[in-house]
Amino acid sequence: PYGHVVAESVEGINTVNGHSYSDPALQSENTNFALLVSNRFTQPFNEPYRYGKHIASLSNMLAGGVLVQRFGDLVSGIRTNEHRMSKSFVRPTLTAAVPGDLSLALPKRQLDDIIEMIYQLDKIAPGTANYDTLLYGAEVKFYSARLALSGELETSLPGFFAVGDGAG
C-alpha cells in the first residue's frame, strides 16, 4: 500500500524499483509490487548479466527511459499513449515514465509469465488485473554480482573483507 515507483540506474540504464512509505505525507493511493521473472539458462549460454542489461536497455531505447503501460492495453496489443494514460483512473507515481508498449521491450516468455501472474493474483486480490493497472519496465535484479576478492576474502579496499553472495 501507499506505493511509489522510483527510477534507478544500473550502469547507466534507467530501471525501476518500488517503495512504500509509512509517513502519510509521502503516501500515494497506489499499491506497488514487483513481478520478477527468473531465467535459468543452460549451456552454452553464459551471459545472464549482459542479457538482463540488454532487456533493460530496450525500454530505454524505446522511451528514452522507463516505459509505463496499462495492463488492459498490453493484453489488447495496444500501445499506451499519452491520451490513453490520461483516461486512466490510476495515476503513475513515476511521472518521468513514458507511455509505451512493453511487448517491444520484454521477451514473450517473460511477458506471458507476468500476464499470467497478474490474472492469478486477481483471483485472490480482485482488481489486480484491472485495465488501468500500470506496469513499468523494466525492473531488473542481478543476483550474480561477484566481488573481486583475495584468497583471504579481502576486497580491493585494504582491510575490508566480504562474505556471502553479495546480493544483499
Task: Locate predicted features.
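Residues forming the flavin
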Residues: 1-168
